[in-house]
UniProtKB/Swiss-Prot annotation:
The protein's assembly and partners: Homodimer.
Binding site for [4Fe-4S] cluster: C115, C118, C206
Gene Ontology molecular function terms on file: 4 iron, 4 sulfur cluster binding; ATP binding; magnesium ion binding; sulfurtransferase activity; tRNA binding
Positions of short motif PP-loop motif: 40-45
Class of the enzyme per the UniProt entry, highest EC level: transferase
Co-factor requirement: Mg(2+); [4Fe-4S] cluster
Protein name: tRNA-cytidine(32) 2-sulfurtransferase
Pathway listed: tRNA modification
Native source organism of the sequence: Stutzerimonas stutzeri (strain A1501)
Keyword terms of this UniProt record: 4Fe-4S, ATP-binding, Cytoplasm, Iron, Iron-sulfur, Magnesium, Metal-binding, Nucleotide-binding, RNA-binding, Transferase, tRNA processing, tRNA-binding
Cofactor binding, per record: Binds 1 [4Fe-4S] cluster per subunit. The cluster is chelated by three Cys residues, the fourth Fe has a free coordination site that may bind a sulfur atom transferred from the persulfide of IscS.
């Protein structure tokens, strides 16, 4: 890739800045960390690796970056693509070979979405491998749009207000998951991926259709953004400004103990005395 245009340079700086802010805001990476970057071969994980390698050079702390891909033995998976790319940029990497494809095909009826089980099997394998190589952080490539989509999916279909946190401790307490692209938009990542000409591996090799509910939510958010530019950013900001007393979760706020405080100073003006 030659010299960057003005817009390309702005794009690169914006992604690096936003990723750096997310890493700092949530203390994602600390001095001496070994960060296992989970690389699928898609635009998001390539961009995450690229940005983390830049941050590794300029950060005031020292941390290792190790790229890890899981070959799930999907038919047609181009096994040579990731090793060739990672060798070309000089990054330490591991390829985990585990035939979860056959397991998923055996368990899920034909025509049903396999993504959920496939994801769980992959996550469990990656958690175990992170332990084996002594990784202190596990980096995933989810971005701002993924987080918002998950929030609305959980609200619409699960009856819960939760999304994907930028930083997460696994249920067993053995792994810390980080999402350095949490502040970055999918549109920027897609543009950056094309600019950098990453060797993208298709995500539909297994033949499974994208989760229909997620696709509906994605299209809804895209339509909102088209009609009201900037709405996505405002909605994401809302996830960072939660006011428990204005919701209805009794576990987050003690509504039962609310009582009148006779010593409190009135907030409102007595209009009758004006």
């Amino acid at each position: 890739m030659g010299n960057l245009s003005v817009n390309q340079n702005k794009l690169q700086k914006r992604l690096r800045r936003l990723a750096g802010e997310a890493v700092t805001d949530f203390n994602m990476i600390e001095d001496g960390d070994k960060v296992m970057v989970c690389l699928s071969g898609g635009k998001d994980s390539y961009t995450m690796l690229d940005v983390l390698l830049y941050l590794q050079k300029v950060a005031p702390i020292r941390f290792e970056v190790v790229a890890v891909n899981m070959d799930q033995k999907q038919p047609g998976f181009p096994e040579h693509v990731l090793p060739e790319y990672l060798k070309s940029i000089g990054v330490e990497y591991h390829i985990i070979e585990k035939d979860t494809y056959s397991v998923v095909k055996e368990k899920i009826p034909e025509g049903k979405t396999t993504c959920s089980l496939c994801s769980r099997l992959r996550r469990g394998t990656l958690y175990t491998f992170a332990d084996e190589i002594g990784a202190t952080k596990m980096a995933l490539g989810h971005h701002r749009d993924d987080i918002l989509e998950t929030f609305f999916l959980n609200m619409f279909y699960g009856g819960t207000l939760k999304a994907m946190p930028p930083k997460l401790l696994s249920d067993d307490g053995r792994n810390v998951v980080i999402r350095p692209l949490a502040y970055c938009s999918e549109a920027d990542i897609e543009a950056y991926s094309k600019m950098k000409e990453f060797p993208i591996i298709p995500c539909n090799l297994c033949g499974s259709q994208e989760n229909l509910q997620r696709q509906v939510v994605k299209e809804m958010l895209q339509e909102w953004e088209r009609k009201s530019p900037g709405r996505t950013e405002i909605m994401f900001r809302a996830l960072q400004n939660v006011v428990p007393s204005q919701l209805a979760d009794r576990n987050l706020f003690d509504f039962k103990s609310l009582r009148i405080d006779d010593s409190a100073t009135p907030r409102f003006v007595d209009v009758m005395s004006l």
